[in-house]
Amino acid sequence: MFKPSAHRRLPREDDIIQEDDEDGPLWPSALRRLSNEEERLKIADGDERKLFSAYPRGSMENRDYKVWDIYFTLGGDSLYAGRILKAVMKFPSSYPLRPPTLKFVSKMFHPNIYEDGKMCISILEEDKQQDSSVFGDPKDKWTPVQNIRTIVMSIVVILNSPNISSPANVDASVMYRDNPEEYIKEVIRIAREEDEKLRRTDPQAREVALQMKAEN
């Protein structure tokens, strides 16, 4: 009878993650998870639906769950109120063992967003990553219990309440600290221009704009 070697060990989660292919297809478990998240987002609380919309790429018959378009639609006294901001979220094959990445497509002028659109937020960081410009408590780093909703809601908080102690955009951080009135004008100007561009060029953004109008 075959006996397993005493020195043989079972694969650990770290081993599985290392084998993840960022450009490969989603694992079946990841596909199921993201499909379920899509359904939950459709029945989200009304107040949350007013803050963002999230859509996997592709048609209903041919979904690409690896890439999602995120549309932020903040209201109230936000500097982005009435505007649409777009970001793209990309998922690794092993999601949720590893976090997705998020990058703004809309041009942003914000202390916690790099000029290339990358977002600095602890919820998207793995334990092994050490980035001093990441916003958030280190205890809040990525775990598999996080999801699209928790990520986006964390970003909403940062958009409205920048943290200048660990900036990704130094110019935005300095202006926010030393010349807040000018910062407000610049953010509003850029948000308006990016919103107008999205509505002209992005069919999904136009659908989001119609939803915003219907809810107001």
Swiss-Prot record:
Question: Which GO BP annotation is one of this protein's?
Answer: protein ubiquitination
Q: To which pathway does this protein belong?
A: Protein modification; protein ubiquitination
Biased composition (Basic residues) is annotated at 1-10
Spans annotated as Disordered: 1-29
- The UniProt entry annotates the active site at C120
Q: Which domain of life is it from?
A: Eukaryota
Q: What's the short name of a Pfam family annotated to this entry?
A: UQ_con
Q: What keywords appear on the UniProt entry?
A: Transferase, Ubl conjugation pathway
Residue intervals of the UBC core domain: 29-196
Which spans of this chain does the record mark as coiled coil? Answer: none
**Enzyme Commission no:** 2.3.2.23
Q: Which reaction does it catalyse?
A: S-ubiquitinyl-[E1 ubiquitin-activating enzyme]-L-cysteine + [E2 ubiquitin-conjugating enzyme]-L-cysteine = [E1 ubiquitin-activating enzyme]-L-cysteine + S-ubiquitinyl-[E2 ubiquitin-conjugating enzyme]-L-cysteine
InterPro entries for the chain:
Ub_conjugating_enzyme, UBQ-conjugat_E2_core, UBQ-conjugating_enzyme/RWD
Q: Which Gene Ontology molecular function entries are recorded, alphabetically? A: ubiquitin conjugating enzyme activity
User: Hey, which family's this protein in?
Assistant: Belongs to the ubiquitin-conjugating enzyme family.
What exactly does this protein do? Catalyzes the covalent attachment of ubiquitin to other proteins so as to signal them for selective protein degradation. Involved in the formation of multiubiquitin chains.
| Protein name listed in UniProt | Probable ubiquitin-conjugating enzyme E2 ECU01_1010
The scientific name of the source species is Encephalitozoon cuniculi (strain GB-M1) (Microsporidian parasite)
